[in-house]
Amino acid sequence: YLQPSAIQFDSVNIDGLTTDQVAQVCEHIPELTGLISNDSLTELLKVPFFIEIAVRAIGNGAQFRTGDTEVDFRNTVWATVISKEADRKSGMPDKRRATFINIAKQRAKKMLFGIRASEFDPEVVAKLEEDHLIHRDQRSATISPMHDVLEDWALEEYIESEYIENSHDLVNFLLTIGNEPAISRAFRLWLYRKLKSDD
């Protein structure tokens, strides 16, 4: 966007944290210590976003254990931050999960910056907004996931559910998920994880 518009800009590369810096963070937040026993999770925690989301998960009751894998980490974050399993009133975890996935899916399918908030249960939207999982644009009355990583995870969840539903007919599976740019990216991530876990 910037180059074709002849806007002057400079690129700034920001490195992740070092292993020593991650260890220092874990000294201050001992609940994270179990995560650094796994090399792949140490690499993950070099990205400050993952430390922040892990701390949010811990605040919601998550317990990370020595030996947790990247899949365990992701499942724990999904259960405690996105679904927020601790708040079970009115079936809220399932509603939160379904709404978050649907927001990401619709945004990807329609290739829009935001989706009209009026299409979703206002109570669920308010809860996701309170937890800083979605952003509301007051001017356009639209919502979108707040974090790219969580949006990718939501799209992978959508793809996984369609795969389970259509595993007997892979052509229909591929037609159902579509090939929009965000879906294609999420499909590559989903397929990589599938192959990595030999599932």
Cite the ranges covered by each PLM segment:
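Winged-helix-like regulatory helical subdomains adjacent to P-loop NTPase cores
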Residues: T33, I58-V125, D137-S144, D148, ...
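Extended charged low-complexity segments that act as oligomerization/scaffolding linkers
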Residues: Y1, S5-G16, D20-A23, I53, ...
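Conserved small helical "lid"/interfacial subdomain of P-loop NTPases
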Residues: Q3-S37, I53-G59, R74-E85
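The conserved phosphate-sensing helix
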Residues: T42-R56
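Glycine-centered, phosphate/nucleic-acid-interacting loop/turn motifs that mediate DNA/RNA or nucleotide
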Residues: H132
